[in-house]
Amino acid sequence: MGLSFTKLFSRLFAKKEMRILMVGLDAAGKTTILYKLKLGEIVTTIPTIGFNVETVEYKNISFTVWDVGGQDKIRPLWRHYFQNTQGLIFVVDSNDRDRVVEARDELHRMLNEDELRDAVLLVFANKQDLPNAMNAAEITDKLGLHSLRQRHWYIQSTCATSGEGLYEGLEWLSNNIASKA
C-alpha cells in the first residue's frame, strides 16, 4: 500500500523533464523567445550560428530547449538535434509574408523525418505585435497544418518581446507531451 502511494505521489509531484527542439527560419525570434522564457527579459541577440540550449522551468516541468540557428546554410544541421525530441517548436515570423512558403517547406521536410515521428508540434506565430502580421488562422493555412493528419499540433499567437502567448504554448506542450508518456 505504501509503495503504491509513493509511486503515485512521485508521479504527481516529481519534476518531469522534456526535450524540446526550437527551429524556424532566421530572424523568426527563436533566441528572443528562449531568453524571454529563461530570464523573463528581452536580450539583444545576434544571428545564431550553431545553437543555444537552456533549461526552462515551468510548473513541475524542466524543459531543455535547444534553439538552433535558422539561416539557410545551417538548416541541414537541424537533423542532428532530432533524436529524443519530444516536442518541436516551430517559430514563424508572422510579418514575413515573403518567406512563409519557405517556412512551410522547411517544416514539412522536417516532419517527414523518422526521428521526429512521435514529437508533438507547437507553432509559435510570432511577432503578433506588428501591424501587418498574419493571424494564427492565416499562418495555419499557409503552413498547411491541416494536412498533418498523423501529427498532434497546435498553433499559438505570440509576441516574444512582451512574452504574450509563450507560457500558453508551454502549457499546451506540457499537457500534450505528458499525455503521450
Swiss-Prot record:
The keyword Acetylation does not apply. Its main location: Golgi. GO terms for molecular function: GTP binding; GTPase activity. Keywords: ER-Golgi transport, Golgi apparatus, GTP-binding, Lipoprotein, Myristate, Nucleotide-binding, Protein transport, Transport. Coiled coil: none annotated. GTP binds at residues 24-31, 67-71, 126-129. GO terms for biological process: protein transport; vesicle-mediated transport. The keyword Protein transport applies. GTP-binding protein involved in protein trafficking; may modulate vesicle budding and uncoating within the Golgi apparatus. PANTHER family: ADP RIBOSYLATION FACTOR-RELATED. This is ADP-ribosylation factor.
